[in-house]
């Protein structure tokens, strides 16, 4: 694996950016339902096509002045490393109480796994109990992940991983910590 080591260093709020990490909104936004709006901390369902247009403009602007990294691409690189994959999936399964999905997640390709971790993993319906469960997802979509500044930040020479108050956002911090 070709790893790039990042030097995290911010000495100014107004200095030149050397790189940014973005997460372009995707299917996780479309997976939002009227029922999940409140849990996702929204007042309404987002229009993905509008959000994508705005994000494309932001990304194009940033690409003119700095290096832009996409969360999903960085996550795929993390998941290509077996030790990092085991650690991240173990933490996610433990935190979100989905230990019975560990093997299924570990068997996925890195790209598929990155997609499922962000877009959501539908729950198995293999029993009457799971059929009657109100929740469609074993791993909820990360509706808010395009706010990458919420889960992590750089202060001086250190990356600060924020612990999110809402359970739905904890996986965002775990992913950013792994990256």
Where are these predicted regions, by residue range?
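The feature marks the mature, well-folded catalytic cores of soluble enzymes
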Residues: 1-179
